[in-house]
Amino acid sequence: MGMQLSDIDLLNLDRFTEGVPHDWFTYLREHAPVYRHPEPGSPGFWVLTKHADVTLVGKDGRTFSSDQANGGVVPIEDISPANDADFGDAKLMLMTDPPEHTRKRKLVNHGFTPRMISRMEDHIRELTTELLDGTIAKGECDFVVEVAAELPLLVIAELIGVPVEDRHKIFEWSNRMVGSQDPEYLTDSDKVLEAQVEMFMYAGALAEERRKEPRDDIMTALLTAEVDGDRMSDMDFNLFFMLLSVAGNETTRNAISHGMHAFLENPDQYQALVDDPSLIDSATEEIVRWASPVMYFRRNATDDVEIRGQQIKAGDKLSIWYASANRDEEVFEDPFRFDIRRDPNPHIGFGGGGPHFCLGANLARMEIRVLFEELVRRVPRVESLGPADRLRSNFIAGIKHLPVRFHSTA
């Protein structure tokens, strides 16, 4: 007997420890691309799995709200007020709609200019070179912990002025907040809120220091930015620090981890990059498509709307699944093949445009590109020493551990 809709349970986190359930998404794209998924104690939520629909909803912030008051972007389940942090009137930028989101985004854009990001490439390459040389010399490593997690932490520390020796505080805070349903990081809601408080206190101290001693860096640019007489409040800055520390760390870490895992499973593609390093730009885009590190975002309908014949009512919850959209057979030829020459590659691994397009997309691309450029330059072959250990989450497509051996000769 074949698969049925009743077999699909996207709230079963244990299933995600085996990998992204692409068999479920393939079935949904074909048989129920807009599907009302059951949820205990609620009317359920809509699951959108097609590239076109995910893109449509992601771009229409008026009809499909990200506002925290309407449920925010994550999780699918509604959060009890007792387990939610109280930020007063301030909200994470991800959890706002225009015009508030537009205001926040304009302020933040003062720090994330192309000039600011491009200025970092030489330094990111230095950090990458030092990191890889030390790790490769050992011969074997846990690629996630020692490489994929380290580089974004080093970059974020540089970006927002965190002393290098404090970078693992970000790693710990991030794991507590994103991995709270994984046995390795398992913690209760109090610990998640504790991590938020610790991050806010740390961000506040950094901001105070930078106001006293401004520098030509992104943090100073953010704190001094002014748009239409509006400046970033202390709470806005704290929330942005948290967003950058968690989102900027987790997504890049997992894109790099999935990239390495894909190369291990497709050694011909790694060899192709060794032989022709000019493929690095298309390889970077394929890594992001393949990884889809953020599997879904949630939205809430503000109006009645119809999608593919399904009647979605105002107030209904929707989940838009990037992990599925990036394997859509109507958009990608042979979507389950990891192909570093893929062209075109209209993936939506960074959100697919719209108001919530990933602010750090260019920085993430740079980190992925530089790391694999420098890796293939040094190591002609990488060997897997064991399976990928995956995060217990239906939100972040995370790999926690990936043991590898580096071979200096092919």
Where are the regions a protein language model picked out?
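Cytochrome P450
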Residues: 1-410
